Amino acid sequence: MAQPRIGQKVVVDVPATTANLGPGFDCLGAALDLNNRFAMRRIEGGGERFELIIEGSEGSHLRGGPENLVYRAAQRVWKAAGLEPVALEARVRLAVPPARGLGSSATAIVAGLMGANALVGEPLSKEKLLELAIDIEGHPDNVVPSLLGGLCMTAKAASQRWRVVRCEWTPSVKAVVAIPSIRLSTSEARRAMPKAIPVSDAVVNLGALTLLLQGLRTGNGDLISDGMHDRLHEPYRWRLIKGGDQVKQAAMEAGAWGCAISGAGPSVLALCEEDKGPAVSRAMVKAWEAAGVASRAPVLNLQTSGSHWQPAEDE
């Protein structure tokens, strides 16, 4: 195992994720077929140098430097492998917009881990990368499906080990994700939540989660509809999203089975059958337009392959 050569390069593709899906707060997440691409290469310089090049206007506020999430994740790999850090450059084709509740930070973490690991010959297993990703992010619901793909339920067992269960999502269920021009940070969304919740609310969520998972497995719209209800976080977060209630109502009236805040928001997730997707998308965009917010609402599939890397020609 050796340090990467100057100019050695890998390309990492990492999917967007939608977390919580209503009742699965901080434990349920799904990968979507919308990818960020990170071209990472070693450059001249010491271990505190990281250069970031963003393709796309959404990332104009993002900066390089040693505190960048991509580089922080890369440093964790090198430390675990017993290697000294090196200078890196990352050129990012940004399709997953930051601060929209689609796991943008998770894509940065996973790319940094996977890219750095690939550059030094993959000394760390995927299980170790998963452990590092959760530790950096602080919660598993985005980084786990971002790395592994699919619909993932993640929980910390009594042994303190993270356990991941891959859940079924029938292909007939489509995800319409309405992505607004406004932003909402995860920290702000978390501050809106209470420190404690009633036991009755927790019980409702447990039941709803069971219904939702069975609905996603079978494609039963009634179960999805009954399952996409939450009492732990959404009652406190919808008020932070301008026009969010109207967008949700418009999606339901257009034929969606259920609606939820995607991650911490402000994007809104609607689940529906395939032939309803275009109508649900149009209705959500129109509702946000009426609230004075520009948006787009792609109809997306579950991404099942997770993140992957490939070598690229040295520069």
Curated annotation (Swiss-Prot):
Q: Which reactions does this protein catalyse?
A: L-homoserine + ATP = O-phospho-L-homoserine + ADP + H(+)
Pathway(s) this gene product operates in, as recorded in its UniProt entry:
Amino-acid biosynthesis; L-threonine biosynthesis; L-threonine from L-aspartate: step 4/5
> GO:BP terms for this protein?
threonine biosynthetic process
Signal sequence, renumbered to the chain = none
Q: Which Gene3D superfamilies match?
A: 3.30.230.10, GHMP kinase, C-terminal domain
- InterPro entries given in the database record: GHMP_kinase_C_dom, GHMP_kinase_C_sf, GHMP_kinase_N_dom, GHMP_knse_ATP-bd_CS, Homoserine_kinase, Ribosomal_Su5_D2-typ_SF, Ribsml_uS5_D2-typ_fold_subgr
The record's PANTHER family line, in alphabetical order, gives: HOMOSERINE KINASE, HOMOSERINE/4-DIPHOSPHOCYTIDYL-2-C-METHYL-D-ERYTHRITOL KINASE
Stated name of the protein: Homoserine kinase
Organism encoding this protein? Synechococcus sp. (strain CC9605)
